[in-house]
């Protein structure tokens, strides 16, 4: 029930921030103490645990959430942005200003993101990442990781928290 409440109160903002993974020099990430099999850090107390996509059942119960897609952090570092990509960055940083959307019980943040991008004709490219059993967002609005510096990439936030696992 707590998870349903969190989903009902979902406030999602996507931000272009940095992301990096430690490695062992052979292309395989190292597992740190406390990390799960997908190399994610423990989920803080009171936050929802990730759910394996293959274990989800989408129900009939509908909820609403607010979703937005922001690349505002690029505005502070435009000098790092590829010249060809600079024109794709909105002056106010919003690719999608906050909008309320409806989703069904069991749908993931990724499901909602796909729906909203499709409805708003906003380009989004992703790949499924078997090692993490989740979707990796490669680009939104034709802005991709590394387009604005070597540590740039897409992250998501739910209820003011950046989950350390894929959407």
Each model region followed by its residue ranges:
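Ubiquitin-like/PB1-type beta-grasp interaction modules and other compact soluble beta-rich domains
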Residues: 2-9, 18-167
């Amino acid at each position: 029930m707590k998870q349903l409440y969190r989903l009902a109160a979902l406030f999602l903002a996507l931000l272009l921030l940095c992301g990096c993974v430690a490695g062992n020099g052979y292309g395989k990430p190292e597992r740190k103490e406390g990390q799960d099999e997908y190399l994610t850090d423990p989920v803080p107390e009171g936050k929802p645990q990730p759910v394996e996509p293959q274990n989800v059942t989408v129900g009939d119960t509908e909820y609403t959430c607010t979703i937005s897609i922001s690349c505002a952090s690029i505005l502070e570092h435009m000098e790092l942005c590829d010249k060809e990509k600079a024109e794709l960055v909105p002056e106010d940083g919003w690719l999608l200003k906050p909008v309320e959307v409806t989703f069904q019980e069991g749908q993931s943040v990724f499901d909602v993101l796909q729906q909203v991008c499709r409805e708003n004709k906003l380009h989004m490219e992703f790949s499924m990442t078997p090692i993490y059993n989740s979707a990796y967002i490669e680009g939104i609005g034709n802005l991709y990781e590394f387009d604005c510096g070597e540590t740039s990439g897409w992250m998501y936030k739910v209820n003011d928290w950046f989950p350390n696992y894929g959407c």
